[in-house]
C-alpha cells in the first residue's frame, strides 16, 4: 500500500510539474508574424492607444503589427526585432494600458477632474501614469487607483460614475506621454485639502483647481 501511495504521489508531482512547465511556457510565449488570438488583440489595442498602430484591431499579427512593435521597441530602447517577447511585454505594460485599464483611467479622470480644463484632466491621467512607472507605487493601474487613500473619488464612490468622451480622450493623451505636470506623483485642491503633509511636497505646477507636486 505504501509503495502504491508513493507511486501515486510521484505521478501527481510529475504531472503537476509538467502542467506548470507548459503553463509557464505558454504564458511566456513570444508573439510574432502569424500569431493570432486575444493576446494579439490586446497587443494591438495597447499599440493603438500609444498612437503606433492605426489599423483595425484584428487579433492577427501581420506586417502592420510588426511595424508598430518595431516602432515601440525603438521608442523605448528595446531590441528591435518586431516580436512581442517578454521584455517588450514588460515595457508595454509599464507604458500603456489595455482596454479595461483604459476604462479605469477614464473613470479616474472623470471622477477627479470633470469640470477642470482639458489640460487639467490630462494632468490627472499623467499622475496615474507617473505612479505606474515609479518604483514608489504599484506597477499597474488597478493597484495604483485602488491603493488605500490614493484617490478621493474612490473613497467617496464617485469613481463609479460613467466617464464622458472627453475623459477617454484625456486618458489617451496621458497614455501617449503628454505630461503637463512635470512628472508629478501627487495633486491636491488647495481649497479643500485637509492633509498637512501634502503641503510639504515640492510643488511643480498649478493647473485649474489643482496643485501638482512631487
Which residues are covered by each model-predicted region?
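Acidic, Ser/Thr/Pro/Gly-enriched interdomain connector segments
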Residues: 2-56
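Second-shell loop/turn segments in exported
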Residues: 29-34, 53-59, 77-80, 94-95, ...
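Short acidic, glycine/serine/threonine-rich helix-capping segments at coil-helix boundaries
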Residues: 32-40, 48-90
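A generic alpha-helix surface/boundary motif
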Residues: 41, 86-87, 103, 122
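Active-site-adjacent loops and short helices of periplasmic peptidoglycan-processing enzymes
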Residues: 84, 94, 99
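Bacterial extracytoplasmic/cell-wall-associated proteins, especially those involved in peptidoglycan
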Residues: 99-214
Amino acid at each position: 500500500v505504501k509503495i502504491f501511495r508513493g507511486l501515486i504521489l510521484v505521478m501527481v508531482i510529475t504531472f503537476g510539474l509538467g502542467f506548470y512547465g507548459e503553463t509557464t511556457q505558454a504564458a511566456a510565449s513570444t508573439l510574432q508574424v502569424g500569431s493570432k488570438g486575444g493576446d494579439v488583440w490586446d497587443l494591438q489595442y495597447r499599440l493603438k492607444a500609444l498612437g503606433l498602430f492605426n489599423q483595425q484591431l484584428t487579433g492577427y499579427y501581420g506586417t502592420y503589427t510588426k511595424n508598430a512593435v518595431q516602432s515601440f521597441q525603438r521608442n523605448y530602447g528595446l531590441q528591435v526585432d518586431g516580436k512581442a517577447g517578454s521584455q517588450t511585454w514588460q515595457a508595454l505594460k509599464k507604458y500603456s494600458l489595455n482596454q479595461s485599464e483604459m476604462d479605469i483611467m477614464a473613470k479616474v479622470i472623470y471622477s477627479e477632474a470633470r469640470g477642470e480644463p482639458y489640460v487639467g484632466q490630462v494632468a490627472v491621467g499623467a499622475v496615474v501614469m507617473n505612479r505606474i512607472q515609479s518604483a514608489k507605487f504599484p506597477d499597474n493601474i488597478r493597484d495604483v487607483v485602488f491603493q488605500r487613500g490614493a484617490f478621493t473619488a474612490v473613497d467617496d464612490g464617485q469613481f463609479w460614475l460613467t466617464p464622458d468622451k472627453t475623459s477617454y480622450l484625456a486618458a489617451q493623451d496621458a497614455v501617449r506621454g503628454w505630461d503637463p505636470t512635470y512628472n508629478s506623483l501627487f495633486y491636491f485642491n488647495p481649497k479643500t485639502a485637509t492633509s498637512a503633509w501634502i503641503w510639504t511636497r515640492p510643488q511643480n505646477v498649478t493647473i485649474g483647481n489643482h496643485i501638482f507636486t512631487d
